[in-house]
């Protein structure tokens, strides 16, 4: 049974659907389509087509393609976003990189954040928030530079979301507190004086913090300093070598443990100062959570869809072929007029082949028209002559048009359909009632029971 996910919590910003009502309608339709024969997803190789859009989130890409959206305004909404991104490569690249950086930072750093117990953890936490602020500043600057050229409602909503957070009291407080904490950390403690007790053999037996300073400690060149310096030169102005250098022994599995223990011990000894730092990090984290960054995660795969479409178009055009924005017609017109059509699956296969083989494979384009005078075609030809490739190209063109994508053709005027049905030859199977003929008759009957005047 298909899963109806139309009631799943909607994303805070949606680059796929103009409204929540349309999102629910499309997802409900997807669930209904899954009750029908859906061999078209396999026969048209939609999973491989998704790989051309993006190497990430392929399951979701295939789901969008298999949705067969029947709402022209939804498809146009997506096409408008692609037009904006296609018109400005800097907008596409910057938006994709910055959003990726924000999401990775949230997943790998901020999400795992715990109460700092060392200077290393404290610095990692603060650096994560500084990275978030840096991304917000870049997006704000990008909006100021590009806003006048943005036409699509989807990208306008996306930047309105970022600008809303940029101007919010939570972001302003987060940014100010991050800057204040960094200033305090870099200016408050630059060196610490530690008292060490030795036994009669000069073996250290205990130690404690004597004090700290906002200035670096310089080597005085005394005998005891040289003992503590572990052989460092007197003129390098260091009491001892850097901790990471001192314990940088590839044979020692305890290296990080030793350094971290020293870090934590000093952090604890400086409790009067570091407690304020910890409280500051807690305050910054609270402001970050108030911004509601978790709502950003739906943007990731939606941006993959839109920016992946742009990269696919640019790749095709760089090879001398064309992809175009389709003119979408209502189901009732039952029409398609496609010029310069090619199969994107074969296009990729040919490109891979041509990298290391001769003779080169050529991608052939074709024209086809469906209207009141031509609604059925009988395609004949020799084996390996391109029949399946051509039929697949027509099906993919229909699917991509309804997904709100540019199609693999130089021009395309096409009506929406309620479903796409395919019936490609199957391999012989072993078992009772599993002959190729029996299997194909059953599948053909399943299709004939479902088709309507608006099916393809």
Across the structure, where does each feature detected by a protein language model lie?
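Conserved amphipathic alpha-helical "coupling/scaffold" segments
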Residues: 1-207
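Conserved P-loop NTPase architecture
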Residues: 116-347
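Charged, low-complexity, helix/coiled-coil-prone segments
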Residues: 59-77, 210-254, 268, 333, ...
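ATPase nucleotide-binding head domains, primarily ABC-like/P-loop NTPase cores
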Residues: 332, 337-456
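Phosphate-binding glycine-rich loops and adjacent basic patches that engage nucleotide phosphates
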Residues: 84-99, 119, 225-248, 259-272, ...
